[in-house]
């Protein structure tokens, strides 16, 4: 009994542990190993619970669906095995453990780039299901029971993971130092592990710490209840259940300068000589211990964090992207985390507890992603925030399905937020001075308007009486055909000009666009694609616009500099036959692009989806205008732009029935430019064939289903009239339609050298459009 007691340090503290922290020796959606072979892993947000790993000397076993994780790992060694999907992760010295998402079995692996680093569970425990797992410095303890079960308590198993003396590889074996008759008979709710000790919450109440080094922790009997535990190598910190304050035991240097009593936390992580926690109010990270914490991100909230020896990584709450920083004073990371979306928490059976919300996967704007968990009945419960970081104010409180919303102080427009943002002294120093400023602005504006009217009265008559002089805007848009008239006998020159083009892009506030789209609600949605969602919006001044909102995947896979470069180019290009960018917003990490609204939908809708049919005169004008838009992108835009996805659904019709080319992007590889330009020509030829025949590009109900395969042989035989759309009455003069067929056939030739340029096509189709006026 004395030997047993020497191995066992028992503290019956009235302790409640509903979920562990994400620290060393505990478990969470992100974890880190220690030592010279340190590496990190996190559970991704794909809905498959795949594991992403990165580290300086880590040979990625490449998760089945994550191809980019290895790109951020310094080691170039490739491994031939996969890490299975996990429900939870926990890190030790040079290895990580987890619970498999499908079987609840334990799985441990190291940083070694071979299968020998993947068998770190003794045979006796490999088929056992576990509900909790905690990797210590060189041992692992786990609570028996199915992870997703409503009953998450059970007896524990412990085993040792040590280094072989001959080749420094890791091996797993049972460890009698952690076995005790008292421990084996107890039922645990949770478990955490450190260097030579483990601590767990007992189902009947209290906490038990056991192992060779457990007596060094120096626990004192207390009646406090605790919510979260994190174990360092020689210390433990816990979050009080009611006050959310932190208490620590063990090695003093690990928790020197620990948080003040008024600091409240929801999560903890531990390194060898430090602890870090996520604050309850604004979800920012605060650290303490014997390290340098000057590099902690300020103004950023986190969902989960994990620490190795000198690096802390976390999952940002605003976009679920990984962020890492040093805690030893060095500003240079030895490796960067991968650009992947990570799970904000662990999947579990609901409902969520008080002061928690169920994370909604739809906010990631990922098509077909409805849950972050492999089992759809499970959910990720995240702690609610109650306050915001400096520079933001609380605009919406936490609900059952969403966290609180923080809005930049730059958007503060009333007294409810001015106190928080401290705007009284800086923005509203004196009411009378503010009124005087408004008066000066009003008088100045009126005087300017009067001056403009006087100048206009003098200058405009001279312009009107000088028909031979054209201004720059007229020259720029003189080739545009405006609103089509149903009277086809009207001369082409008398067709009304296209609407004016917005001369510059506007910077919008996020709040403006949220209001304009009714909070980006589904009933405002116009469409969706790989970039994100497109919403119909009505601005405060009554203008109708289309707002394209990038999804999270687009944001993290697009370099910020690349986006800024593309945005600068899009802001500067203007033409009456493209959908022009009106403005943008990048507040709160969003990427919102505001475009002209096209009320008559797409060409595809009118040709194939039962919308109002288009007359032959209008179809040919649309063909010509589309060619003009592509010609501008190819030859006049700076730098020139290759569309890359020319199709009838990317030809939009504005309020005047003018064709506008939409959804064009940039090409960065100069080696592919010529090929891509010819691809634009080919795809434009397919659009011409759709206009001519009324058939889709691919129609499985037709034989042959490919429109090019069906039409080209007929056109080359001189029988183009046989493929003309029969749902529209043939005009008296079919010659323009036959010319249109010939132009389309040139575009879809297999040899790019035989294809015309967009300038040639625009010129030819302009002549065809003139001939079409005598239908």
Curated annotation (Swiss-Prot):
Instruction: Give the record's glycosylation annotations as residue positions.
Output: 57, 102, 167, 213, 220, 241, 261, 292, 328, 360, 414
Q: Which residues lie on this side of the membrane: Extracellular?
A: 24-439
Q: Which residues form the signal peptide?
A: 1-23
Topologically, how does it sit relative to the membrane?
Answer: Single-pass type I membrane protein
InterPro entries in alphabetical order:
Kinase-like_dom_sf (IPR011009), Prot_kinase_dom (IPR000719), Protein_kinase_ATP_BS (IPR017441), RCC1/BLIP-II (IPR009091), Ser/Thr_kinase_AS (IPR008271), TNFR/NGFR_Cys_rich_reg (IPR001368)
Q: What class of enzyme is it?
A: transferase
UniProt xrefs under SUPFAM superfamilies: Protein kinase-like (PK-like), RCC1/BLIP-II
Which Cys pairs does UniProt list as disulfide-bonded? 352-381, 384-398, 388-406
Major subcellular site:
membrane
Q: Which residues lie toward the Cytoplasmic compartment?
A: 461-775
Q: Where is the Protein kinase domain?
A: 520-770
Q: In which tissues is it expressed?
A: Expressed in roots, leaves, shoot apical meristems (SAM), and floral buds.
* Residue windows of the TNFR-Cys repeats: 351-406
Q: How does it assemble?
A: Homodimer.
Function, please?
A: Serine/threonine-protein kinase with low activity.
Q: What is this protein called?
A: Serine/threonine-protein kinase-like protein CCR1
What species was this sequence derived from?
Answer: Arabidopsis thaliana
